[in-house]
Regions:
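Short, Lys/Arg-enriched C-terminal cap helix and immediately downstream tail that follows
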Residues: 208-220
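Short amphipathic alpha helix immediately N-terminal
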Residues: 168-184
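Short glycine/proline-centered loop/turn elements that form peptide/ligand docking sites
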Residues: 152, 185, 207
Length: 220
């Protein structure tokens, strides 16, 4: 039994990304006879899309051992059930078992990291030419688990569009983003600019939000 997790930015997936995902899921189902797909929360368009495609895979492979596992914070026990109702899933299409992550109660990001660090396959939708916590989580997971198989469904044309949008940032934001991507630390960059590292974080956050906001408009 292999464990599959997902991590991605909160964008509506392009048609090309969905097609890549379906293809990768079919290949995975051919390679692995027993698969668990792990989820935690349904707070992003990305995770909602992943659930829809896993449910579709289960329908296409009715005789294969494919399970949906819901890792839950006891405070949000019904998150999966509510989403399943929204998607009008039948009872057999909902999660196969539920795992209470009690030791991480009320720490959503820690549950996500705990899941990712223990998975065999990680399906990702991120862009390395932009700073976000998802890329950091992937790097940490790879360092912790050298055998982790990472499957990217990102789209090259979107990566190119991100470069175009970065070029439209004002000089300060662009300098900060490019410097951090090149390996500069927040503290050293703060000293260079004469500002606090916290202010550097704020600048990066604003730049990232501007780019994601534009991408969301274009991908509607």
């Amino acid at each position: 039994m292999v464990k599959v997790c997902f991590i991605g930015i909160s964008l509506r997936l392009e048609h090309a990304a969905i097609e890549r995902l379906r293809s990768e899921l079919d290949v995975l189902a051919q390679q692995e006879p027993e698969i668990e797909f792990w989820f935690h929360g349904f707070h992003s368009d990305f995770i909602k899309s992943m659930l829809e495609e896993v449910v579709s895979l289960k329908k296409r492979k009715p005789n294969q051992h494919i399970e949906i596992v819901d890792a839950v914070d006891p405070i949000e026990l019904d998150a999966f059930k509510k989403k399943a109702q929204e998607m009008e899933l039948s009872e057999e299409e909902q999660y196969d078992r539920q795992l209470r992550a009690d030791h991480y109660i009320a720490h959503s990001q820690r549950i996500d990291r705990w899941m990712v660090n223990g998975c065999d396959y990680l399906i990702t939708y991120t862009y390395e030419n932009l700073l976000d916590t998802e890329n950091t989580t992937i790097k940490l997971a790879r360092a912790k688990n050298p055998n982790l198989k990472v499957i990217s469904i990102s789209v090259p044309s979107t990566a190119e569009r991100i470069e175009e949008l970065k070029a439209q940032l004002d000089d300060r934001k662009k300098f900060v983003v490019d410097s951090l991507l090149d390996g500069a630390s927040y503290s050293s960059l703060g000293r260079t600019l004469g500002i606090t590292s916290n202010r550097v974080h704020q600048i990066v956050g604003k730049a990232t939000r501007l780019i994601y906001r534009q991408l969301k408009e274009e991908l509607k």
